[in-house]
Amino acid sequence: MAAISSPPLTQKALKVASPDTLHLVTDAPLPTLGQDDSVLIRVVCVAINPVDGKSAEMSPTPGATSGTDFAGIVVALHGDAKSRTETADTIKTGDRVMGFVFGNNPHVLGNGAFAEYVTLPRRFLWRVPDHMSLEAAASLPVGVASVGMALHYLRISMSSLLKAVSRSIAAPSASQPHDGAFDSDANVFILVYGGGTSTGAIAIQILKAAGFHPITCCSSESASRAKRLGAVATFDYQSATCGRDIRDYTNDSLTLAIDCLSESASMAICYEAMGSAGGRYVSLDPFPVRGCVRRSIVPDWICSFTQFGQSIPWAPPYNLDERPDDHRLAEEWYHLAQKLLDAELIEAPTLEIRSGGLLHVPEGVAAVKLGQIKRRKLVYHISEEALP
């Protein structure tokens, strides 16, 4: 292992103590660099996601470090990773990076974002572009990874996506329709239910960059931002005719939907909006089986932790076997997403930045769980050392 400085032997970390309870430990060991391309990062900022509170309540692993989204500074590399630092695409010590980690992980108790140090394989990290702050960077990883996984489950080809995104980067002002990145004759509309959520907003931007025509269901308060980010049309989810209006707008041709809320009401609107030919529906959480009211629509749901190539031994329905195809897809997606980030084609959500470090992060986890954080992402400073 090579390092630009000697990390301490112990660190502060938020550990799962019991259901719905996180406890600050001041003498936790640092996570180990256990893989050939693993990287040790000093955490500067973390963002709060619903899964942080949900997993600690639903499937707590006592002693496991909590937290998913982070941004920070690379301080050490595994020896094999160091040998590849001559290539331009390889992360080096001192680089600003962002990523998300499988917190509350029964397989690896000592690695989570809510800590002073975290480790991840190089292939699951993004460099933070020069134009982006670490606070903004911390707000993006779970969302960006989830969108990539959702596109994969919609059967959209990563190679075709890469070609479309490359064209957008080369000619950002040009409006170029998509030309067949999925295995059907469906048109270019894709419905994003929840365009006002962080992940929904990211999905809209990525779909636009890939040449699709994203449409979204969101609140009236979120509609203007969704359009600015690239939605060609917005629909108020509170309207009794929302699903029918989308179906009319798309001329009965909608075949693909991403549901960022994964509730009975959101699923019902997505199903009503889909054209008579059916299609694919992907939710970001387990969907209610009773909502599967049309045989022509193939439903599925994602759990982005499957990208790490491990089983997920949480309580049902999150007890998932290893999914090698998700792991392979994620490596391709991270490469593509870095291009989007570098080209400034993904804008961070509105941020609420709080200080207080790890000691106050549980307050933020509770606030997100209670639904008190609307249309913004909650970010905490963990280390002030690397901030300007």
UniProtKB/Swiss-Prot annotation:
- For binding substrate, which residues are annotated in this chain's numbering? 142-149, 304-308
Q: What induces it?
A: Expression is positively regulated by the cluster-specific transcription factor tenR and is induced during cocultures with the natural competitor fungus Metarhizium robertsii.
Q: Which residues bind NADP(+)?
A: 51-54, 219-222, 237, 284-285, 373-374
Q: Which EC main class describes this enzyme?
A: oxidoreductase
A Pfam match:
ADH_zinc_N
Q: In which pathway does it act?
A: Secondary metabolite biosynthesis
Q: Which SUPFAM superfamilies match?
A: GroES-like, NAD(P)-binding Rossmann-fold domains
Name of the protein in its database record: Trans-enoyl reductase tenC
Organism of origin is Beauveria bassiana
